[in-house]
């Protein structure tokens, strides 16, 4: 059975996010799509995501565009089902009266969306998340000030670090670009590293939210060792063999099938 367009688009966007270039021939070989299907999907992507450039028989991810909103839109599309699963699990760990840090990123945004009926205090470092929380009447939300990363809407740099020092909370929900048993939590850029590290330092309990694609991967910038993390929340796409390996290493995993 051939894949539906939304599934094809997600596969192509995921490849483009990682490699910044996808040719018609590559899409045909990697995903088994017909040439006519690839061409139609390329045109659809260009129409929906203005930062994508269609060349002769290819698509390119335009990092130089002034329209940075699409960068966030692409990232939010990747592993969207997994992110919603993770957010739903994380929501079960939150009770009325809690005060916690909520990190930046699309998975954390999904958790923010789950807080509409919560009576909590949330400190965040993300413009999108702050905007979401500001709509909920019983959520007392604080946003950390500092430099905003274009296209990602996270807040960082030295001013943000100073403001985080004003808080000390019971729990933090953080995200990451990659994690492995050997190198711990790592990030693709330095921008969020300082904030993540400081949030971990100012929290008594740290919950890492990471979809299955983040496991056994390494990015250039170190954030923390896994010993700093109390619980890792992931999705149903995490292979059992990987889950068992992390559990044997002492990691506490919270997965959809953990709920009986």
Swiss-Prot record:
<comment type="function">
    <text>Putative transcriptional regulator for the sgcREAQCX region.</text>
</comment>
<keyword id="KW-0238">DNA-binding</keyword>
<feature type="domain" description="HTH deoR-type">
    <location>
        <begin position="5"/>
        <end position="61"/>
    </location>
</feature>
<dbReference type="Pfam" id="PF08220">
    <property type="entry name" value="HTH_DeoR"/>
</dbReference>
<feature type="DNA-binding region" description="H-T-H motif">
    <location>
        <begin position="22"/>
        <end position="41"/>
    </location>
</feature>
<keyword id="KW-0805">Transcription regulation</keyword>
<keyword id="KW-0804">Transcription</keyword>
<dbReference type="InterPro" id="IPR036388">
    <property type="entry name" value="WH-like_DNA-bd_sf"/>
</dbReference>
<dbReference type="InterPro" id="IPR001034">
    <property type="entry name" value="DeoR_HTH"/>
</dbReference>
<protein>
    <recommendedName>
        <fullName>Putative sgc region transcriptional regulator</fullName>
    </recommendedName>
</protein>
<dbReference type="InterPro" id="IPR037171">
    <property type="entry name" value="NagB/RpiA_transferase-like"/>
</dbReference>
<dbReference type="InterPro" id="IPR018356">
    <property type="entry name" value="Tscrpt_reg_HTH_DeoR_CS"/>
</dbReference>
<dbReference type="GO" id="GO:0000987">
    <property type="term" value="F:cis-regulatory region sequence-specific DNA binding"/>
</dbReference>
<dbReference type="Pfam" id="PF00455">
    <property type="entry name" value="DeoRC"/>
</dbReference>
<dbReference type="GO" id="GO:0006355">
    <property type="term" value="P:regulation of DNA-templated transcription"/>
</dbReference>
<dbReference type="InterPro" id="IPR050313">
    <property type="entry name" value="Carb_Metab_HTH_regulators"/>
</dbReference>
<dbReference type="GO" id="GO:0098531">
    <property type="term" value="F:ligand-modulated transcription factor activity"/>
</dbReference>
<dbReference type="InterPro" id="IPR014036">
    <property type="entry name" value="DeoR-like_C"/>
</dbReference>
């Amino acid at each position: 059975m051939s894949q539906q367009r939304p599934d094809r688009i997600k596969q192509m966007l995921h490849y483009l996010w990682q490699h910044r270039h996808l040719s018609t021939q590559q899409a045909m070989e990697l995903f088994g799509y017909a040439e006519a299907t690839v061409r139609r999907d390329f045109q659809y992507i260009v129409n929906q995501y203005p930062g994508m450039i269609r060349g002769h028989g290819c698509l390119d991810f335009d990092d130089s565009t002034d329209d940075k909103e699409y960068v966030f839109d692409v990232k939010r599309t990747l592993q969207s089902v997994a992110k919603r699963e993770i957010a739903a699990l994380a929501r079960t760990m939150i009770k009325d009266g809690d005060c916690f840090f909520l990190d930046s990123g699309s998975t954390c945004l999904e958790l923010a969306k789950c807080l509409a009926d919560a009576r909590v205090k949330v400190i965040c470092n993300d413009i999108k998340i702050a905007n979401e929380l500001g709509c909920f009447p019983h959520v007392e939300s604080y946003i950390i000030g500092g430099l905003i990363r274009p296209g990602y809407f996270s807040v960082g740099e030295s001013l943000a670090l100073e403001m985080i020092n004003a808080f000390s909370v019971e729990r933090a929900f953080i995200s990451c670009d990659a994690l492995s048993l050997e190198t711990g939590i790592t990030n693709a850029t330095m921008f969020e590293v300082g904030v993540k590290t400081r949030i971990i330092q100012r929290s008594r309990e740290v919950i890492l939210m990471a979809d299955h694609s983040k496991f056994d991967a390494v990015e250039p910038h170190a954030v923390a060792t896994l010993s700093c993390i109390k619980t890792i929340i992931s999705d149903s796409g995490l292979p059992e063999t990987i889950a068992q390996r992390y559990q044997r290493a002492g990691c506490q995993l919270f997965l959809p099938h953990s709920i009986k």
